Amino acid sequence: MKNVTFPANENVLKSLQLAIQSYSNYLSSYIDALNKYISHQRRVSTLRFERATLIKYVKKLRFFNEELMSMDMVQQYRGGNLIKTAVCSLASFFIRCLEVMDLLNYYLTQSLKNETISKTLNRDLVVSEDCVVFLESTYRHYVKFTQWMLEALDIHDATLTVEVLQFARKCAKEDGLDLEETDDILLQEVGVVSSASEYQELLDEWCLVLSEQYMGLTKAFEAETTRWSEIFEGRK
């Protein structure tokens, strides 16, 4: 086992701050898109309950986002703290966000979709399959990043796990999958770093990957909101 007890130097803390910004961008993309969808839902009286549920989700995402924006990793953890201490605290909050995002994605792609189609008889008022692909891909990348944050420092804690990751591993084990050959990002193994500089370098690379995911998701949401606007306006 490698010695991964590194001090939290300022460079690493600044990179963790970039990770916080990446999560904030992720949440903001949902907040912006859902606010527009909620506004359109006002035109359909039969969707009052669904609209109220989405408003509840948006409020939760806003709360998380405000908490993220108030975090200052350099100020909080410089001066003798270990990287593990900062990462465990941050990952714990990220996991809270991910659990809500998992429920929200399910609501958008299953419950809300089914209720909207049932009440309006219109399949165009829901999240499109093209957008769902981006929802799932982006979520899985943020899950994997959070797992990497921890396991790259050889942190294995039952309280710092994401349900979807545990489920994927359980299914893979039951199916006898070779994890070294899988293309599933959730099942790919994480290597332990040997230095703080290596951790920072990989952390920065991950932030670039998350940025690409966020931009793809944002474009998908923009296409959806444009489509929703045209459809809902046509129902006036």
From Swiss-Prot:
What's this protein's function? Answer: RNA-binding protein that binds specific mRNAs including the ASH1 mRNA, coding for a repressor of the HO endonuclease. Part of the mRNA localization machinery that restricts accumulation of certain proteins to the bud and in the daughter cell.
Q: Which GO terms describe its molecular function?
A: RNA binding
What keywords tag this UniProt record?
Cytoplasm, mRNA transport, Nucleus, RNA-binding, Transport
Taken from the UniProt entry, a GO cellular component term is:
cytoplasm
What is the official name of this protein in its record? SWI5-dependent HO expression protein 2
Q: How does it assemble?
A: Homodimer and homotetramer.
What processes in GO biological process is this protein linked to? Answer: mRNA transport
Report the subcellular localization.
Cytoplasm; Nucleus
Family assignment? Belongs to the SHE2 family.
Entry keyword annotation includes Cytoplasm: yes
Q: Which Pfam families match?
A: She2p (PF11435)
